[in-house]
């Protein structure tokens, strides 16, 4: 009986200490993933910002729609775009948040797919309008028309393509 009890205690100690090291590894791995996601988002943001214009694709029923945009912003660790709530694009995104962005810079282009989520908080709208002050002529953080949307974390795939280099795929 004593031997069985000693064995059980030793086994429990090994299991518990093993679990602790697994948790430490998992926490370190999660931090690494978070950092990689952050770097991928920043690289995506920088590419689109330098391209100046990107094209946003949405769907209305079975009909795709594409239009040019110019707003891209990082706020609270998320990648945001902006539009007017009264526009068809807003209605399409509220009905189906799946979207794709394409931008071209020199001989490279980026495709970003993901799910866009409406963020109606004043802080998010104000942050976007601070980065794009020229929009303050048409929009306000306090109006009912300004709409900012962020890419839902974990749904985003960004691929940078080039005629000269292999594609670079990033997820965040």
Model-derived segments and their meaning:
Residues 72-106:
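A short mixed-secondary-structure module that forms the rim of ligand-binding clefts
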Residues 46-61, 99-103:
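A short, Trp-centered hydrophobic/proline-enriched beta-strand micro-motif
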Residues 64, 78-79, 156:
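Hydrophobic residues embedded in beta-strands of well-ordered beta-sheets
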Residues 33, 37-49:
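Short, basic/aromatic recognition patches
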Residues 15-18:
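C-terminal motif of bacterial Sec signal peptides marking the signal peptidase cleavage site
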Residues 22-36, 111-172:
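Charged, gly/pro-rich active-site loop segments
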Residues 1-4:
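Positively charged n-region of N-terminal signal peptides that target proteins for export
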Residues 60, 85, 105, 116, ...:
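A mature extracytoplasmic/lumenal domain signature
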């Amino acid at each position: 009986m004593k031997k069985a009890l000693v064995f059980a205690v030793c086994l429990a100690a090994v299991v518990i200490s093993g679990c602790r090291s697994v948790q430490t590894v998992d926490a370190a791995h999660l931090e690494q993933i978070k950092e990689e996601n952050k770097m991928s988002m920043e690289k995506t943001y920088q590419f689109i910002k330098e391209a100046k214009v990107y094209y946003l694709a949405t769907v209305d029923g079975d009909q795709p729609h594409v239009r040019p945009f110019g707003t891209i912003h990082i706020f609270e660790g998320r990648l945001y775009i902006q539009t007017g709530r009264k526009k068809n694009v807003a209605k399409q995104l509220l009905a189906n948040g799946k979207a794709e962005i394409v931008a071209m810079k020199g001989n490279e282009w980026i495709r970003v797919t993901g799910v866009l989520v409406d963020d109606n908080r004043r802080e998010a709208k104000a942050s976007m309008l601070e980065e794009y002050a020229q929009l303050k002529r048409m929009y306000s953080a306090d109006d009912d028309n300004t709409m900012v949307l962020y890419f839902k974390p974990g749904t985003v795939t960004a691929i940078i393509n080039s005629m000269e280099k292999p594609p670079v795929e990033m997820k965040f």
